[in-house]
Structures are given as C-alpha cells and as structure tokens.
C-alpha cells in the first residue's frame, strides 16, 4: 500500500472531501487508513467494568477507517502543500523508494 502511517493525506471524495489529516493507522490487508479528524462516527458504548475502574457508557465520537483510494498524499514543495499520487523507484542498492509523482521528489 502506498500510504503509510504518519503521512499527511487529503480526502478526495465523500462527505469529508477536501479535509486533510495525518494517518494514524494503516490496514494494508483491508486497504484502509485511519485519518485524524476524518470520517468521525458515533459509537454507542455500554457501561461496564474495566481493569482500572468503571467505564462510563454513552455516545463516543471516534474516527473510522476509510478506503485508501479515497485519499491522496500531501507533500510540501517550496512552502506550498501539493496533492500528489505515489510511485516507486529503486535506488542503486535495490531499495524501493516512494516518489511523489507530481513533484518527482523522494518521500
């Protein structure tokens, strides 16, 4: 998967289109990413005991994963943020390196 944990991405489709955020977690098997502040959903939790004490029930707002095809990587070039696709190249030692397709720079 071309998007990794710690990358800054922009949502390109859906209810949060245009929002930017940092990738909190990546799930390559499901091809989904968890983006900070994007795709917030409300979960209804039941009160119950936990190891540290009692857990309060109620409605909790949290982020839900979104499909990786709905986000694009954001890179910085000359002080401006640029939305780009990701490609790969191999260096002299055979290591795989991610490349921003729009700027041509290594990520």
Curated annotation (Swiss-Prot):
Q: Which GO terms describe its cellular component?
A: ribonucleoprotein complex; ribosome
Q: Which InterPro entries match?
A: KOW (IPR005824), Rib_uL2_dom2 (IPR014722), Ribosomal_uL24 (IPR003256), Ribosomal_uL24_CS (IPR005825), Ribosomal_uL24_KOW (IPR041988), Translation_prot_SH3-like_sf (IPR008991)
Q: Which PROSITE patterns does its entry note?
A: RIBOSOMAL_L24 (PS01108)
What CDD domains does the record point to?
A: KOW_RPL26 (cd06089)
Q: Which Pfam families match?
A: KOW (PF00467), ribosomal_L24 (PF17136)
> What are the GO BP annotations of this UniProt entry?
translation
- Give the record's keywords alphabetically: Ribonucleoprotein, Ribosomal protein, RNA-binding, rRNA-binding
Gene3D superfamilies found in the cross-reference section: 2.30.30.30
Q: Name one GO molecular function term.
A: rRNA binding
Q: Which family does it belong to?
A: Belongs to the universal ribosomal protein uL24 family.
Function of the molecule:
One of two assembly initiator proteins, it binds directly to the 5'-end of the 23S rRNA, where it nucleates assembly of the 50S subunit. One of the proteins that surrounds the polypeptide exit tunnel on the outside of the subunit.
Subunit structure, per the record?
Answer: Part of the 50S ribosomal subunit.
Name assigned to this protein: Large ribosomal subunit protein uL24
Origin organism is Streptomyces avermitilis (strain ATCC 31267 / DSM 46492 / JCM 5070 / NBRC 14893 / NCIMB 12804 / NRRL 8165 / MA-4680)
Gene for this protein? rplX
